[in-house]
């Protein structure tokens, strides 16, 4: 039951050996295809104590000899769940000690955070990012997170419901600078079966049972409904994300060329705001090439402009698309950043601090 702490150790058997080989083969192939690991790489597994992260730790231990990375682990105690959080920390400390994996534990105060009265998911995410920044600064090459194909499916459904474009539909990427996700090829059911088969305990986070969070409502409602229609629904959704990622990469390359061309083909007379932007060495883009581009390519180009400023949700990209089509006006993206169009060009105005 949720919150009780862990599952009992099961017996080993021939079925486990087959299961372990199958899962290790899937992760090995996925890691090779996406070039996740390198010899000598300093790899740190982010371990919460749940089934996914404990499966990640055990799988990385098994694959360590053939890939040659240096494996450590980290655990972030957010301080939000009282005794349950302390129980999870103690559990992870014990398991890493038993497995011989060096562990780094973080508390909010370690990275200058204080727990606010109503700390939510965004605060917890920022805390983890701050902890990972410390690891990277101390020499960790890559943090390995335990996101699975089930997480990928949930992410896709959540983004589609909120409104997303091709970039968002690509979901969680197998790797990005400083991070990798080796278990995107496995479902949550597979990580639990792997742990059960190899006798690996895990802790249960009781907040996963609460429907107070939108992602949990998807997990408890939408995904079971999709599985009833097709048992492979999670894998199929994750596979769609892979295709979306490839398409997004293709359009991103084309979008970069489009923006480069638009920076060159500027009219001779520019609005005062665009002149000022250029004096500050900020880019200015000709509207003509943008207006003539395929709508999908335009969206990809504008996504590249939005993403450094704020989360590139579909609504902000659509606002910029409308601005480009109209050829005049302004879109306020944040308190400090505004996009302007006029005089045949598009430019960015940033507030002076």
Predicted features and spans:
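AMP-forming adenylation/ATP pyrophosphatase catalytic core
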Residues: 16-52, 72-76, 108, 127, ...
């Amino acid at each position: 039951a949720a919150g009780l702490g862990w599952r009992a150790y099961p017996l080993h058997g021939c079925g486990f050996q087959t299961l372990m080989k199958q899962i290790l083969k899937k992760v090995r192939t996925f890691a090779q295809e996406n070039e996740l690991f390198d010899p000598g790489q300093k790899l740190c597994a982010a371990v919460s104590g749940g089934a996914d992260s404990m499966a990640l730790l055990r799988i990385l231990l098994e694959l360590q000899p053939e890939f040659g990375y240096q494996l450590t682990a980290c655990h972030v105690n957010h301080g939000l769940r009282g005794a349950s959080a302390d129980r999870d920390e103690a559990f992870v400390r014990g398991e890493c000690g038993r497995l011989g994996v060096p562990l780094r534990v973080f508390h909010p105060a370690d990275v200058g955070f204080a727990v606010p009265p109503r700390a939510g998911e965004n605060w917890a995410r920022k805390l983890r990012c701050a902890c990972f920044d410390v690891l990277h600064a101390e020499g960790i090459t890559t943090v390995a997170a335990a996101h699975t194909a089930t997480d990928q499916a949930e992410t896709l459904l959540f983004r589609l419901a909120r409104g997303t474009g091709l970039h968002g539909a690509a979901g969680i990427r197998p790797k990005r600078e400083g991070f990798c996700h080796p278990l995107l090829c496995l479902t949550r059911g597979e990580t639990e079966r792997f742990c059960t088969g190899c006798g690996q305990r895990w802790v249960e986070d009781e907040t996963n049972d609460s429907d107070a969070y939108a992602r949990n409502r998807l997990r408890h409602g939408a995904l079971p409904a999709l599985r009833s229609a097709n048992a492979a629904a999670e894998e199929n959704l994750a596979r769609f994300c892979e295709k979306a990622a490839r398409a997004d990469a293709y359009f991103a390359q084309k979008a970069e060329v489009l923006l480069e061309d638009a920076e060159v083909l500027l009219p001779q007379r520019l609005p005062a705001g665009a002149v000022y932007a250029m004096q500050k060495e900020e880019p200015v883009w000709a509207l003509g090439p943008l207006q003539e581009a395929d709508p999908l390519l335009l969206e990809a180009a504008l996504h590249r402009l939005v993403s450094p400023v704020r989360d590139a949700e579909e609504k902000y990209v659509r606002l910029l698309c409308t601005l480009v089509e109209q050829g005049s006006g302004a879109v306020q993206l944040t308190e400090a950043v505004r996009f302007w169009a006029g005089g045949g060009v598009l430019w960015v105005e940033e507030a002076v601090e």
